[in-house]
Regions:
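N-terminal Sec-pathway targeting helices
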Residues: 1-17
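Alpha/beta-hydrolase superfamily serine-hydrolase fold, recognizing
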Residues: 17-218
Length: 218
């Protein structure tokens, strides 16, 4: 009995110490990836075109980041950030640090909003894919107006945004050729039985509602 009590005390102590050390790390370091990509930004670094419209029914917009010193006689390349948030939260502002970072590496970058499931707009992944494709068309037009030719792009995103980035990369409908895609923690398997938590978050009451959100088909 005493041995079991000692083991229990050791386990509890380990958990407490682990949680405290993790909390201290977060307080001292913050979000490590964000800190690694944080850059100083001013007019000498580049120009930001904020809150530009693209074709969609729900007033979604995009932000465009143009690094200074790009040669307009040469091909340029775009990195498009698509925010995550379980398809029901997040915004293009989530990609600000990423866009600024990659802009300092010489890439034109952009971050886009899309219709979220909780906005009551009958959103589906099909609609989100369509909106992002429209955003790419508009970004292409805007950069051409500014005198840049984008020869290729890389969509990227986190979680739900990563899924949408892969959809853009592989559905073959991008107005700008996709050279590669990169993402973090993007789901690729959407059987309702594996997504009970997402169904709760998105307040979906049945598998039929889940399929509707995924496909847009009633």
């Amino acid at each position: 009995m005493k041995k079991k009590t000692k083991i229990l005390i050791y386990v509890i102590t380990f958990i407490v110490v682990f949680l405290i050390s993790a909390l201290i790390r977060i307080m001292l370091l913050g979000s490590a990836p964000e800190r690694l990509i944080k850059v100083e930004w001013d007019e000498s670094v580049g120009e930001i075109y904020s809150n530009h419209d693209y074709e969609n029914d729900n007033v979604n917009q995009y932000d465009l980041y143009i690094p200074s010193g790009l040669d307009k006689s040469e091909n340029q390349y775009l990195i498009l950030f698509i925010h995550g948030g379980s398809f029901n939260s997040g915004s293009k502002e989530d990609g600000e640090s990423w866009c600024k970072y990659y802009a300092t590496k010489g890439y034109i970058t952009a971050s886009v909003d899309y219709t979220l499931q909780n906005q009551g707009k009958d959103a589906s992944i099909y609609l989100m894919n369509e909106e992002i494709e429209n955003a790419v068309k508009t970004i292409k037009q805007k950069t051409e107006e500014l005198g840049y030719h984008i020869a290729g792009m890389a969509p990227c995103g986190v979680s739900a945004g990563g899924t949408l980035a892969m959809n853009l990369a592989y559905n073959g409908n991008s107005a700008i050729p996709v050279k590669f895609v990169f993402q973090l923690a993007a789901p690729t398997y959407f059987a309702p039985s594996e997504w009970s938590l997402l169904m709760k978050v998105d307040r979906l009451n049945s598998e039929e509602e889940f399929y509707k959100m995924m496909t847009g088909i009633h």
